[in-house]
């Protein structure tokens, strides 16, 4: 699935295993946490990863699975530092919504991550609840968007 308009130079599509090195190259967290690479490789191998391309280069990626109480769930959205604040994350969340097989799509972030909270609100997600004790002193806020 490729998604692009004439006015928007960002292309979104399903990531392939061969895309993983370029995806990890744009992910600053992955540079210092090797386990991120394992997570991304596994997701790409299962077809659970979408990427955004700008001018042929990976601008970001999103993971999507359907194992959160059998609903779609986005556990990770990554945008290259050079592409941040340009709508890439919104495009990735929209692509995840289009690829989601369920009527609800969930995601989450730490209470301390104000940028992610603004992103999710801007993408149409609403607060659904929270989970304590994942990161002590920093509750995980759960969000949902109703797709159908």
Task: Kindly give the residue locations of the regions a language model identified.
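Conserved N-terminal glycine/acidic-rich loop preference
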Residues: 114-127, 132
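Short acidic/polar active-site loop segments enriched in Thr and Asp
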Residues: 70, 103, 126
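Conserved GNAT acetyl-CoA-binding A-motif
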Residues: 99-111
């Amino acid at each position: 699935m490729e998604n692009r308009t004439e006015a928007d130079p960002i292309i979104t599509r399903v990531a392939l295993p061969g895309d993983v090195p370029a995806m990890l190259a744009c992910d600053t967290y992955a540079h210092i946490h090797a386990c991120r690479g394992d997570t991304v490789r596994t997701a790409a191998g299962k077809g659970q990863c979408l990427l955004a391309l700008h001018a042929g280069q990976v601008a970001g990626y999103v993971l999507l699975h359907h194992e959160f109480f059998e609903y779609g769930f986005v556990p990770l959205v990554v945008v290259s530092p050079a592409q941040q604040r340009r709508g890439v994350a919104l495009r990735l969340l929209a692509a995840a919504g289009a690829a989601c097989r369920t009527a609800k799509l969930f995601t989450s972030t730490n209470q301390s991550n104000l940028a992610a909270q603004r992103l999710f609100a801007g993408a149409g997600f609403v607060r659904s609840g929270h989970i304590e004790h994942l990161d002590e002193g920093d509750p995980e806020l759960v969000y949902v968007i109703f797709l159908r």
